Amino acid sequence: MERTEFEIPGGIPPRRNGGQGRAADTNVDANLKPDEYDAEVTLRPKSLTEFIGQPKVRDQLSLVLTGAKNRGVVPDHVLLSGPPGLGKTTMAMIIAQELGTSLRMTSGPALERAGDLAAMLSNLMEGDVLFIDEIHRIARPAEEMLYMAMEDFRIDVIVGKGPGATSIPLEIPPFTLVGATTRSGMLTGPLRDRFGFTAQMEFYDVPDLTKVVKRTAKILDVGIDNDAAVEIASRSRGTPRIANRLLRRVRDFAEVHADGHITMGAANAALIVFDVDEVGLDRLDRAVLDALIRGHGGGPVGVNTLAVAVGEEPGTVEEVCEPYLVRAGMIARTGRGRVATAAAWRHLGLEPPEGTIGDY
């Protein structure tokens, strides 16, 4: 099959080895970009039956919510953990929708003081769902106040300062807390133990991601061929947010260089233009592999050294690039540093040396 049926303006972009761009420019970062919020809201499913993927989590949540509604009580507090872009925020919205209640949203970094949390809790109505994103980053004073709120539906508000300060108990209407975290290991034991239901969101397989792409295309009123949807899904790192982002970029290409309908040729040509290769790696991912293999013989190399080589911050390499490269079997973490596997060597068109990890 022809890889493309379009002439790409300026030719195929070079596979740059340097790190001139920043991570914020990448199309395969699973974190939500500031300009994507409105688009995300319109694409989010509104019910558990409409939600694609995560069948185990959906079934378990359905039981929890249905049981609570049948008993006439608020459901247990819910903790959703997993990498960014898999639907944790969407699931919180669906929980409120399924319960027929209001959703109040905040984030861990926004709750710096106990007073910040007290203000949120005091405005809740009975049965409301309070969603705290990045709950692992909540400040300790606010976290300690949250313990009592979750268990007893009350908090103690301190009025005054010094010896004259007094504690006033404040009753809170029963509510359900939904916490989301990308780093469940950073949660304290007391906080984790107060969640009655915990769920781990998993990466998507290509068939489910293909359904996501087709659903999004329908909402955006964009025609798309099945093989084009599969191609976009296969390059989306198992993440719906990335699949939706790539679909929007492919749509842009198809509208400019074709009749707006997304064919396999349009999808391939667009993804070349936007520098996303056949396994979902972008410029920065390939720069990391290139620095590791061509620059350091395959490793082991520390993350700080890799970051300098590609011109990025160590946190960017560690949080944006490395998780997928490890999951894709291209990088192995060892006690001495990062090591390129045989798959990484071959992805760059090189023959791995004898004894390389994964060379069977």
UniProtKB/Swiss-Prot annotation:
Protein name in UniProt: Holliday junction branch migration complex subunit RuvB
Organism: Corynebacterium glutamicum (strain ATCC 13032 / DSM 20300 / JCM 1318 / BCRC 11384 / CCUG 27702 / LMG 3730 / NBRC 12168 / NCIMB 10025 / NRRL B-2784 / 534)
InterPro entries: AAA+_ATPase, AAA_lid_4, DNA_helicase_Holl-junc_RuvB, P-loop_NTPase, RuvB-like_N, RuvB_C, WH-like_DNA-bd_sf, WH_DNA-bd_sf
Molecular functions (GO terms): ATP binding; ATP hydrolysis activity; four-way junction DNA binding; four-way junction helicase activity
The UniProt record lists the keyword ATP-binding: yes
GO cellular component terms listed in the entry, alphabetical order: cytoplasm; Holliday junction resolvase complex
Region annotation Large ATPase domain (RuvB-L): where it falls in the sequence: 24-204
Pfam family, one: RuvB_C
Recorded superkingdom: Bacteria
Residues holding Mg(2+): 89
Main location: cytoplasm
Region feature Small ATPAse domain (RuvB-S), mapped onto this chain: 205-275
Oligomer and partners: Homohexamer. Forms an RuvA(8)-RuvB(12)-Holliday junction (HJ) complex. HJ DNA is sandwiched between 2 RuvA tetramers; dsDNA enters through RuvA and exits via RuvB. An RuvB hexamer assembles on each DNA strand where it exits the tetramer. Each RuvB hexamer is contacted by two RuvA subunits (via domain III) on 2 adjacent RuvB subunits; this complex drives branch migration. In the full resolvosome a probable DNA-RuvA(4)-RuvB(12)-RuvC(2) complex forms which resolves the HJ.
Family of this protein: Belongs to the RuvB family.
Stretches the record annotates as Head domain (RuvB-H): 278-360
Binding site for DNA: 333, 338
Keyword Nucleotide-binding: yes
Catalytic activity: ATP + H2O = ADP + phosphate + H(+)
Catalytic activity, EC: 3.6.4.-
Entries under CDD domains matching the protein: AAA
Record's function text: The RuvA-RuvB-RuvC complex processes Holliday junction (HJ) DNA during genetic recombination and DNA repair, while the RuvA-RuvB complex plays an important role in the rescue of blocked DNA replication forks via replication fork reversal (RFR). RuvA specifically binds to HJ cruciform DNA, conferring on it an open structure. The RuvB hexamer acts as an ATP-dependent pump, pulling dsDNA into and through the RuvAB complex. RuvB forms 2 homohexamers on either side of HJ DNA bound by 1 or 2 RuvA tetramers; 4 subunits per hexamer contact DNA at a time.
GO BP: DNA recombination; DNA repair; SOS response
Binding site for ATP: 43-44, 85, 88-90, 151-153, 194, 204, 241
UniProt free text on domains: Has 3 domains, the large (RuvB-L) and small ATPase (RuvB-S) domains and the C-terminal head (RuvB-H) domain. The head domain binds DNA, while the ATPase domains jointly bind ATP, ADP or are empty depending on the state of the subunit in the translocation cycle. During a single DNA translocation step the structure of each domain remains the same, but their relative positions change.
Subcellular location: Cytoplasm
